[in-house]
Amino acid sequence: MSKRVVLTGATGLIGKKLARKLHERGDVPVIISRDPVQARGMAFVNEFVKWDYKDPKPVLKKLEGAHAFINLAGATVAERWSDPYKMVILNSRVQTTDALVHAISLLQEKPKVLISSSATGFYGNTGDNEVDETSPHGEGFLADVCVAWEQQAHLAEEHGVKVSIVRTGVVLSPEGGALKKMIPAFKFMVGGSLGAGTQWMSWIHIDDIVDLYLHLIDNPQDGVFNGVSPTPVTMDVFVFQLGRALKKPSLMKVPSFMLKLMFGEMASTILDSQKVIPAYTEKSGFHFKFPELDEAMEDLLKVYSV
C-alpha cells in the first residue's frame, strides 16, 4: 500500500536519493521547503509544501495522514565554524525539529514515526575505542549539537509517535560529500591521507543509508540507529582503498596543523577518530549491501575505473 512520507532536507545528498526511491516504489514523497523552487527540479516529486517552519496551521492539511516524517534538514558543517555560523548549524537543526514536533502535535492523524537525522559526531573523539548506540555522548561542539537535536526529536514521543534517530557517519557518494571532494586530488596524482592517518572513520555507502531510512519507514520503531557500515577503517586505509579504486597513488599527506590552519575548529570533523559500530541497526533486521569498504569504493567509482 502506498505511503505518504513527509521530508525536510530533501534537496540534500541523502534526501534526493531517498525521495527518488520512495517515488520509484510507489510511495508519495511530500517535500517541505522554505523555497520549493529547487525542490521542484526533482521531476519524480509532485507534492511540495512551502513552509518557513513558523506557524504550521496553514500547512497542516497537507501533512495529515502521512505515514512518516523524515527530518534531514540542517546547514552543512563543512564550512569554517565562526561563532555566528555555529549558531546557524545548531538552529537549522533544533528549530526545524521543534517546528516539526509542534506540527505533529496539532495533527488529527499523526504519523507512525518521526525519523530524525543525527550524526556520529554525537560520540565526540573516541580514539581507538569502539562505540555503539548505547555509548554516552562525547565532548565538543558537534556532540552538543547532536544532543540538543536528538532531545528535540524525542519530544514527539509525548504525542504517541515513535522516534527513530539515525546517527549518520561519512556518507560515500561521487555526487556529493567527502568522497566527491577527495576525488579530484587523486585524479591529479596528489591524493593522500589527511592528518595522522590513524584516526578511525565510520563510513556508509549512499545506497545503504537510503535503504536504512526505507527500513525504518517500513518498520516503525523507537530507538537510535548508527548509520555506518559494520567495518570502520582508519584514514590511511580509506585513502588507500580510494586510490586503488581510482587506479591512482595515495602518497601525499596533509598534516594536522595545516588542516587546522585551513579550516579552524571544523578540522575536527576530519581529525577526530570515531570507531562506530551499527549494533542496534543490525539488531533491527537491517542488512548492508556494502559492509566492506573495497566493495563500496568499487561500486561507487566504477565510472572512473573504465
Which residue ranges define each predicted feature?
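C-terminal amphipathic/interface module of NAD(P)-dependent oxidoreductases
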Residues: 268-306
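N-terminal Rossmann NAD(P)H-binding glycine-rich loop of SDR-like oxidoreductase domains
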Residues: 5-25
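Alpha-helical substrate-binding/gating segment
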Residues: 183-191, 198-233
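Conserved Rossmann-fold NAD(P)-dependent oxidoreductase catalytic core, especially the SDR/UDP-sugar
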Residues: 98-140
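NAD(P)H-binding glycine-rich loop region in Rossmannoid oxidoreductase-like domains
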Residues: 41, 46-96
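Catalytic helix-loop patch of NAD(P)-dependent Rossmann-fold dehydrogenases
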Residues: 91, 95, 127-165
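Mid/C-terminal beta-alpha module of Rossmann-like enzyme folds, strongest
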Residues: 218-265, 298, 304-306
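NAD(P)-dependent short-chain dehydrogenase/reductase
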Residues: 143, 147, 155-165, 169-200
